[in-house]
Regions:
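Active-site-adjacent "subsite" loops/lids of carbohydrate-active enzymes
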Residues: 28, 34-36, 40-53, 124, ...
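Catalytic domains of carbohydrate-active enzymes, especially glycoside hydrolases
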Residues: 53-80, 182-186
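Pro/Thr/Ser/Gly-rich low-complexity, intrinsically disordered linker/stalk tracts
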Residues: 376-441, 495-507
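Aromatic-lined carbohydrate-binding/catalytic grooves of carbohydrate-active enzymes
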Residues: 65-102
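Aromatic- and acidic-residue-enriched segments that line the glycan-binding/catalytic groove
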Residues: 80-95, 130-156, 192-216, 260-271
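Substrate-binding cleft of secreted/luminal carbohydrate-active enzymes
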Residues: 278-282, 286-304, 321-398
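Beta-strand-rich modules
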Residues: 477-498
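Active-site neighborhood of glycoside hydrolase catalytic domains
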Residues: 167-175, 181-267, 271-296, 302-311, ...
Length: 507
């Protein structure tokens, strides 16, 4: 008896943590993960078939961890992990810039399809200005930076598009337009690289010629910020002109300005977006140019120079509420740092995000640490913090809802019991992703299946009732007992949910 009591006592903290997290688990929460390719040699060392299998394995594990969105890098250094008529194939895909995969395939097309099959969003991640990532990289003679060198700057051994040139802004917008028009992505995502980061104590100083040409006597800092502002405004308009439902998200460095620089700033002492990268991210949110911000709070909770806890509160209080706010957390630092009687900071950070009224989710840096189960990160997310399925936050006018599904009924597929339903007439799966003129924001793109046991209250706000999010019109329910109730809803391109279907009761 004492032994049983001892075991129960040992389990109680774990059980209480699980049930506390379960009770707080929201139905709507952005749960993303970054999958970068820059610096990741595993892609170039695989055959196309192995690359596809690897991507599927990463997506499977992120799905297991409870993620509902993937931010996949497709343009790390003015190159492409997709079929492009504008830029060369990426070195990080094949080992040589401009070399196509053999046999040919399209990673972006593939990852969009596979993410959507798992009920996950796909955000196409581009670095806008970076051309090279190291001093060792040699660009071909016909590269645009060699053909029009005046449009580029060199700093710290790297090459960048000069943000001052209107031609560069239009070039980047054309890249975005091509991607948005041809691929069924959910968002365009830029990271934190705008004007180059300082190289140690040396700040960026390589734009003297363009300042002399375009500066018109303006304060240089203001002029640089204006150059980046123009790009963000142009990219935003470009996206919305093609597909209004495709979102534009930015993941900036985690500090806007320090309070020592600006009384509106945060209690921090690190590098600053506004002053060092010339990125006025709060302005972009206020102007409505971006749909979400995901500041990179990659530090430990109470690091003196950059305390994630205080910074999360600061972003919550200062980002315009019409712009969605997600927090980017570093998995490795989170799992390495014990806090109080907890072995890591994971539960505290998840709880922190959920406690802040304007924070609508998290993004994990990087996804490979999740899929690799770094110090149990995947296990803890899957079993506790993201144990129940969650829908990404809705955008736009939420009074508008998509068409509901009809004819929900029990059936059998390949000997398995299933719940199936009829697709709405405007189901997006019936429309080619390239046929932009036929697409609407209200097109249903996936379906949510709810399960309630006999006698259980029907509550569609309870995420514990969600058993599947799928673009298909059937789910397996082999173990459904008599009296179980199933309800299905549609989700449109803006993540808005339809009215519920009729109830299907297992006889």
């Amino acid at each position: 008896m004492k032994r049983i009591t001892a075991i129960i006592c040992l389990l109680l903290p774990l059980l209480s943590a699980f049930f506390a997290s379960a009770a707080d688990s929201p139905k709507r929460e952005f749960r993303g993960a970054w999958l970068h390719v820059i610096g990741q040699t595993q892609y170039m060392n695989k055959t196309p078939e192995q690359q596809r299998n690897y991507i599927c394995d990463q997506l499977d594990k992120l799905q297991e961890a409870g993620c509902n969105a993937v931010i996949f890098q497709i343009r790390p250094t003015a190159d492409a992990l997709y079929k492009s008529e504008i830029e060369p194939w990426s070195y990080w895909l094949t080992g040589k810039r401009g070399k196509a995969p053999e046999p040919i395939w399209d990673p972006l097309e593939f990852v969009v399809k596979e993410s959507h099959m798992r009920g996950m969003e796909l955000h196409a991640w581009l670095n806008p200005y970076r051309v090279t990532s190291s001093t060792k990289e040699v660009l071909p003679a016909n590269h645009i930076s060699n053909r029009e060198p005046q449009r580029f700057v060199k700093f710290n051994g790297q090459i960048f598009f000069d943000p001052a040139y209107e031609e560069n802004r239009q070039y980047i917008a054309d890249i975005v337009a091509d991607i948005v028009a041809r691929y069924d992505i959910d968002a365009i995502h830029f990271d934190d690289y705008f004007y180059p980061y300082p190289a140690g104590a040396k700040k960026f100083d390589a734009d003297g010629a363009s300042y002399a040409k375009f500066g018109n006597g303006k304060n240089k800092g203001d002029w640089r910020r204006e150059n980046v502002d123009k790009l963000i405004e142009l990219v935003s308009a470009t996206i919305k002109d093609i597909k209004p439902w495709v979102r534009f998200g930015i993941s900036p460095f985690g500090i806007w300005r320090n309070k020592s620089t600006d009384p509106r700033g945060s209690e921090s002492g690190g590098l600053q977006n506004y002053d060092d990268l010339y990125a006025d991210v709060l302005l972009w949110a206020e102007k409505g140019w971006i749909d979400y911000l995901a500041p990179q709070l990659y530090w430990t909770l109470d690091l003196k120079v950059a305390p994630t806890r205080k910074l999360a509160y600061w972003w919550n209080d200062n980002v315009d509420p019409k712009c969605h706010l997600y927090i980017g957390y570093d998995v490795q630092r989170t799992m390495n740092n014990a806090i109080g009687n907890k072995p890591n900071e994971l539960s505290t950070k998840v709880d922190l995000s959920r406690s802040l009224p304007n924070v609508k989710g998290n993004i994990w840096w990087h996804g490979y640490w999740v899929t690799g189960n770094y110090k149990g990160a995947l296990d803890e997310l899957a079993s506790t913090h993201q144990a129940f399925l969650s829908l990404a936050p809705a955008y736009g006018d939420t009074s508008i809802t998509p068409s509901k599904v009809t004819n929900v009924h029990a059936g059998s597929i390949d000997g398995h019991n299933v719940i199936t339903w009829d697709y709405p007439e405007d189901y997006a799966g019936a429309v080619s992703p390239a046929s932009t003129e036929e697409q609407e924001a209200t097109d249903p793109v996936k379906f949510v299946v709810y399960e309630f046991f006999e006698g259980e209250e029907i509550d569609l706000s309870d995420p514990r009732a969600i058993i599947a999010v799928t673009p298909l019109n059937a789910v397996r329910v082999d173990s459904a007992e008599k009296g179980t109730v199933f309800i299905v809803t549609s989700i449109d391109r803006m993540n808005r949910e339809s009215e519920p279907s009729q109830r299907m009761i297992v006889k």
